[in-house]
């Protein structure tokens, strides 16, 4: 049962760990926002009455807002006032519908959490337990020092082989480093401390040492 070749096991572990690190890099909160946005687009097509009403109200609000902006409050005050009341009413109804539909967001977040658990966490633990004694590959005798061969065989296999525990640790570190290198150029730059901030800190330090306010 669950008999799998070493090469397939290597690839399977690599895929699962890559998916895990990619999810960590993107962030669970980002995935939840993407899932919620997708659900908001699909829900009206699935017949969810609240989302259908929310879409209709948003269309009406956009129409009223456009019409209100196209007229002058001074020249057509009565019409502008009427449109303004409609705008306020629609805004209130939309906010109420958003509060009602927000309950669905917790379910979406829960399902996304389950998907992450099923696709990454559970497979990793399954591999660790079920294939803990599997030898993925062997090093030729004498290639590595004996103490290193012994370490790579930890904790369940014979000296000279590489087991799943060491392999998963190595792959996890490599994938994490690669993702970090890919993300790094796109990270926001940390601004240098301004000269004013530096002068302010210097003044504070002088006050602490001398006990008198520093001259500006």
Swiss-Prot record:
Residues 30-116, 179-216 are cytoplasmic. The chain crosses the membrane at residues 10-29, 117-137, 162-178. It comes from the Eukaryota. It is found in: Endoplasmic reticulum membrane; Golgi apparatus membrane. Residues 1-9, 138-161 are lumenal. Keywords: Coiled coil, Endoplasmic reticulum, ER-Golgi transport, Golgi apparatus, Membrane, Transmembrane, Transmembrane helix, Transport. Its main location: endoplasmic reticulum. The keyword Transmembrane applies. GO terms for biological process: tail-anchored membrane protein insertion into ER membrane; vesicle-mediated transport. GO terms for molecular function: protein-membrane adaptor activity. GO terms for cellular component: endoplasmic reticulum membrane; GET complex; Golgi membrane. Residues 197-209 have a biased composition (Basic and acidic residues). Residues 193-216 are annotated as: Disordered. It is a multi-pass membrane protein. Pfam families: CHD5 (PF04420). Residues 54-105 form a coiled coil. Required for the post-translational delivery of tail-anchored (TA) proteins to the endoplasmic reticulum. Together with GET2, acts as a membrane receptor for soluble GET3, which recognizes and selectively binds the transmembrane domain of TA proteins in the cytosol. The GET complex cooperates with the HDEL receptor ERD2 to mediate the ATP-dependent retrieval of resident ER proteins that contain a C-terminal H-D-E-L retention signal from the Golgi to the ER. Belongs to the WRB/GET1 family. Component of the Golgi to ER traffic (GET) complex, which is composed of GET1, GET2 and GET3. Within the complex, GET1 and GET2 form a heterotetramer which is stabilized by phosphatidylinositol binding and which binds to the GET3 homodimer. This is Golgi to ER traffic protein 1. It comes from Debaryomyces hansenii (strain ATCC 36239 / CBS 767 / BCRC 21394 / JCM 1990 / NBRC 0083 / IGC 2968).
